[in-house]
Amino acid sequence: MNRNYLASSIGLLFACAIGAVAAQAAEPAADYKINPEYTSTSPDGATTVEQYARISADGDYTWQFWARRQDKLTLLKPEQPDYAAGFRFTSDSRWLVRMQKTGAGYASLYLYRLGPQGFVAATAKPLSDLAGAYFKRRPESRKIRKPDFHIEAGLVKGTDDNYRSLGQDWPDSRYLVISLSGEVSPNSRHGQLRSVRGWRCRYDLQKGTFDVPPDFAEINAKAIAPER
């Protein structure tokens, strides 16, 4: 048998084996059990987000999040210790936001988009990290004490009606409204301070950029005003 042919055949078999293993891995491991309480469905009914937990011998939880579409599962990374998550779809069912508690007083946001293979990460970093970095570049952030703990990012309710409930008239499934909060650790000069309390910005899903609409001016001024 020709050596080149043999090498090619072995390589092809190896690649097929790897592909088969990868295909088999596209589902939760046997020790992860679904918790139906946290299952959610997209507005068009085509995608279901399922949450699976693995419980260690010590009672510690590790959560995985899977999007099921046409009987195909895709993992919504990363997995999370201790806490289940909340999920919201845009009204066109093509974008998915994960609202993730990560600790006492801490919360992050992850953004996923619908692609040919199902839902995948839409940003290289968590959406909450990008929003926090945007806030730090804003001039108003230089007027306050910098939050250093209890950092929380939340998705403001309104994706289901494109924020018309907030009085907005934006294009369908175009924007997300994000709320940021954070505290300053106590020291010898002051106690624990909530220096940011629900500051809002808007994320453009088409452009991948942030801005602050004029309508947010009043609520944002209150969000960073000194506590009385």
What function would you assign to each model-found segment?
Residues K77-P81:
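Surface loop/turn motifs at the tips and blade-to-blade linkers of beta-strand repeat domains
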Residues G19-N35, S108, P116-R228:
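Acidic, small-residue rich beta-repeat scaffolds with periodic aromatic anchors
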